[in-house]
Amino acid sequence: MSKTYHFIGIKGSGMSALALMLYQMGHKVQGSDVEKYYFTQRGLEQAGITILPFDEKNLDGDMEIIAGNAFRPDNNVEIAYADQNGISYKRYHEFLGSFMRDFVSMGVAGAHGKTSTTGMLSHVLSHITDTSFLIGDGTGRGSANAKYFVFESDEYERHFMPYHPEYSIITNIDFDHPDYFTSLEDVFNAFNDYAKQITKGLFVYGEDAELRKITSDAPIYYYGFEAEGNDFVASDLLRSTTGSTFTVHFRGQNLGQFHIPTFGRHNIMNATAVIGLLYTAGFDLNLVREHLKTFSGVKRRFTEKIVNDTVIIDDFAHHPTEIIATLDAARQKYPSKEIVAVFQPHTFTRTIALLDDFAHALNQADAVYLAQIYGSAREVDHGDVKVEDLANKINKKHQVITVENVSPLLDHDNAVYVFMGAGDIQTYEYSFERLLSNLTSNVQ
């Protein structure tokens, strides 16, 4: 039976994906948000989903209302109106927890790599069988006939606790979100609580010391590069400018050679996790092998374009571990080019907590350009940290730039420009693209 769904904050990455999925399942969908453009809204617009400004008149008691986690009565008129008038709504993660009960559900959790791995698993499985999925890049697919549901499982504020999937991957555990988590131990405890809710199979990166301590009632399968102690092992790596080829063994049994057209050691691990899960769930590895070959990645994860013969990479990396992985991928694909990092720190709390780690990660590039720190809506700038504090710790060529003047980036020949961040780093990227386009109109 068709329902009408209203999304408060429909442009959020998870919210937009869920809206698309429900729309494709035959439901009526609309939503509200701020006017500012977000990359997630293009898919909504292409589907013809109405995006309204926030207004209490948008709400109807007959709708099922899903509210973004950032919105409260003190910062959103629709939430305030709903609370005052007894109109019920569910938060995104609450809705998802009940929704997935009707499917064979497969979650992907982890401090880093969730979106890429969810995208890879969704791509492969949806080419094998009818599958609905939610990816953290704002992509969603829904089918009324789907048996399987793949989703991204987010640890922030323990939002993944309503989820009880049959299968789940945990890519890694790392200290992040210092505005919520107090320590690495706090992060571990959240993941360990989540792991106890998996029912059929948990797949964890075996070379992560924290993940080795995870406990679950479901069978735990470890994956990694090292043969000792891991169940699924990737070996015989061949990393080239066209992607990565590797062999996977399961407890000594050769499962064959696989190829992915993506870059970086982290993506080999992501693929090994996907292979392990689908093998354990009983899927034909020949089909898995075939469809891994065609996985091109997800939005804002090593997204490439060429402007005036200049390679520009856009990536969501906003944690030191992610920066290192992205720069490693860039060197694999472009071994003869200079790697220029253009990075915007995201949140003051994260920048303070990980300042030295950010400097170490960015020093993997050949040159570094920094944008001003992008503060979260959840925090206030108390002046405790400035981007210059990070710049002072970088030992490669570096400079702080503004969106109005990105011309210092032109100082490099034969370079790849890697724009990284979770704020509005894309405005710097677009400014640079306009600068390049003004030099010549040759745009691909």
From Swiss-Prot:
Q: Which SUPFAM superfamilies match?
A: MurCD N-terminal domain, MurD-like peptide ligases, catalytic domain, MurD-like peptide ligases, peptide-binding domain
Q: Which domain of life is it from?
A: Bacteria
GO cellular component, alphabetical, reads:
cytoplasm
Q: Where in the cell is it found?
A: Cytoplasm
- Binding residues for ATP: G110, A111, H112, G113, K114, T115, S116
Pathway connected to this protein: Cell wall biogenesis; peptidoglycan biosynthesis
The molecular function terms of the Gene Ontology recorded here are: ATP binding; UDP-N-acetylmuramate-L-alanine ligase activity
Q: Which family does it belong to?
A: Belongs to the MurCDEF family.
Its recorded name reads: UDP-N-acetylmuramate--L-alanine ligase
- Its source organism is Streptococcus pneumoniae (strain JJA)
What gene codes for this chain? murC
